[in-house]
A protein has these predicted regions:
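C-terminal and inter-domain tail/linker signature
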Residues: 2-165
């Protein structure tokens, strides 16, 4: 009887079924989107055919090439230099992470994925977001990101705050 072989198989089985730290994967993904911009590193956190949907502005991408193009042309390395993210809460499930956060920045450039076609206004923005990331194993399958577009438009001066509030 080969007892060491049985122990090795048991150890491999446990490692295979070990849950992934989805929160850490989420953090790594966001790091490469905003803090240390790197499209290729961002894509490595995702499945082969992911999708990203920024619901309020109907921006994002479908499939590897669509998401990579979106990150390259609209998001990664394209945010204002003073962008800050404040994490409010996180809920982690078996295969999903939901984050509530506040994104702060000065509208000093066109932000294609949020305000397509809108030139810089120089206004400060403080915008709550909800991010839903679905995972397949240790890779992100999709992202759904929500914010209040009317609040964003009011903060950059494109919507009368009296009308909005």
């Amino acid at each position: 009887m080969n007892n060491s072989g049985d122990k090795k198989r048991q150890r491999q089985r446990k490692q295979h079924h070990r849950p992934h730290d989805l929160g850490a994967i989420f953090e790594k993904h966001v790091k490469y989107e905003f803090e240390d911009p790197d499209v290729e590193a961002t894509m490595k956190t995702m499945v082969k055919e992911p999708y990203v949907h920024h619901v309020p502005a109907l921006t994002g991408g479908i499939g590897y090439n669509g998401v990579r193009d979106f990150y390259t042309n609209q998001l990664v390395g394209k945010m204002p230099a003073d962008t800050k993210i404040q994490h409010i809460s996180r809920t982690v499930g078996k295969d999903q992470v939901v984050d509530e956060l506040i994104l702060r920045f000065t509208h000093d450039r066109e932000i294609k994925f949020m305000l397509p076609g809108i030139p810089p206004t120089g206004k400060s923005v403080e915008l709550p977001h909800v991010v839903v990331m679905k995972f397949n194993g240790n890779k992100i399958a999709h992202e759904h990101i929500y914010w209040d577009q009317a609040s964003l438009l009011a903060q950059v001066g494109l919507l009368d705050k009296k009308t909005y509030l």
